[in-house]
Every structure is written in C-alpha cells, then in structure tokens.
UniProtKB/Swiss-Prot annotation:
The gene is dcd. Belongs to the dCTP deaminase family. SUPFAM superfamilies: dUTPase-like (SSF51283). It comes from Kocuria rhizophila (strain ATCC 9341 / DSM 348 / NBRC 103217 / DC2201). The lineage of its organism: Bacteria, Bacillati, Actinomycetota, Actinomycetes, Micrococcales. Bifunctional enzyme that catalyzes both the deamination of dCTP to dUTP and the hydrolysis of dUTP to dUMP without releasing the toxic dUTP intermediate. This is dCTP deaminase, dUMP-forming. It is an enzyme of class 3 (hydrolase).
C-alpha cells in the first residue's frame, strides 16, 4: 500500500523512516522530494573495451565534485551517476521507490535507468542514474529537487532486511554515487 503524506510525516516524526537532513517542506501528497548532492561519477570510456557486469572494473568511473553554487552540466546522450543529498534509512516493513520529477522529465532528464526500488532495511544515499535525453545540455544544481521517494507498507516485516547479509548488502551505507558492484553477486544461468 502506498503511504500518504499524513503517514509519511508520522513515520518521519517517529524516526521509523529517516531522511537526513529532513525538511518537512519536501513532503508531497504521497511522496517526499529528494535533492541532488554535489558528487557525480563519470564514465571513463577509454579505460575498457566494453563493460562486463561479471568483472570488477575499478577504473570504469571517476568521482567528480562540484562546488555548492556551481552546476554540473549533463550533455545530450550523456549518462552519469549522481546521489541524493538525503541519507535514507528504512525499517524492515517499509520499501521505497525513487521516481523522477515530472518538471525535469519534461526537460529530458531521467533520474534512474532501472534501479528505482529501495529495499526495506536499506540505509544510505540513493545513487541516481542520470541521463539527458534532450538535445541541449541540462544544468544540474546541487541542492535542487531531482526526484521523489514513494513509500510502501509491506504486508509484514521482511524476514531478512537489506543489510542483514542474507540477500546481499553491497550498497548498504553508501555515501555519494556508488559504482556498480554487480561482480560481487553475478549470476548467469546456462541456457541450452
């Protein structure tokens, strides 16, 4: 069940859901707006011939920090990783989903490619998968609204929350945009 503004405020006030820093003005009818941090992870395409999710490729991306009053310019067709300014901490019975802001989507900005789901038990800054689908560069300002979190009440607490280790916890506690760690649990079924 999608959680309403009333229940979002109740969970934030009680500390069951934590957003740090928290700003009550960010609460919307059924979501909470999140803001863009100052760090971006750019792809160094010349380091590898291809991307292989099975292999660790530590030099695939590099971290870039912009000044608080300086925008990051995302060019047409470019893909970078960003992060939410807010650290998000969820209990074992609430999941979240990151959605883009419609005003930014109408400018051609995608905030996530596929990874919008946030498991119960997660704690950390949410990595954003930022793409510019427009034909002009887009300025991304640190501290500006970049997305929104919708919260879902589970039917019961999960047996193994994210971070417990049972299902993996590769991104627990992440700070800033975190590169893929797919090699740590790569699975491939042999299909004949």
């Amino acid at each position: 069940m999608l959680i309403s503004d009333r229940d979002i405020r109740r969970h934030l006030d009680s500390g069951r859901v934590r957003l740090e820093p928290s700003d009550p003005a960010m609460v919307q009818p059924a979501s909470v707006d999140v803001r863009l941090d100052r760090w971006f992870r750019l792809f160094d395409n010349h380091k590898y011939a291809h991307i292989d999710p099975e292999q660790e490729q530590p030099e695939l991306t590099r971290l870039v920090e912009v000044a608080p009053d300086e925008p990051f310019v995302l060019h047409p067709g470019e893909f970078v990783l960003g992060a939410t300014y807010e650290k998000v901490t969820l209990p074992d019975d609430i999941a979240a989903r990151l959605e883009g802001k419609s005003s930014l989507g109408r400018l051609g900005l995608l905030t996530h490619s596929t990874a919008g789901f946030i498991d119960p038990g997660f704690s950390g800054h949410v990595t954003l998968e930022l793409s510019n689908m427009a034909t002009l560069p887009i300025k991304l300002w640190p501290g500006s609204k970049v997305g929104q979190l919708c919260f879902f009440q589970l039917s019961s607490p999960t047996e193994h929350p994210y971070g417990s280790g049972a299902y993996g916890n590769r991104y627990q506690g992440q700070r800033g945009p975190t590169a893929s760690r797919s090699h740590l649990n790569f699975h491939r079924t042999v299909i004949e």
